[in-house]
Amino acid sequence: MSANEPVSVHLLDREYTVGVAPDERSSLMAAAKLLDSRMREVRGSNRMAAVDRVAVLAALNLAHELQQLRDEQQARNR
C-alpha cells in the first residue's frame, strides 16, 4: 500500500493541497478541473460572490447530476 502524496489543485484561482494515492492522482486532477469549471459557471460574471457559496452551489449541482445518473442506472437494472 502506497502512502498519499501531496498534490496541489486550483479552484477559482486558489491553491489547495490534498493528499492522494499516486494511482488516483490523475482522477483527482480531473475532478478538480471539473469542480473548478462548475464553480466558474456558478460564479458567472459576479466576481464578488463568496467562494464558499459558489463551492456549495457547485457541489450541489454535481451531487444532483450524480443522483440523476444513479437513478437512471437503477431504472435500467430493474
Q: What feature does the model see in each segment?
A:
Residues 1-2:
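N-terminal intrinsically disordered, cationic/polar leader segments
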Residues 9-61:
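Amphipathic, hydrophobic secondary-structure cores in small proteins
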Residues 55, 59-77:
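Long, hydrophobic or amphipathic alpha-helical segments
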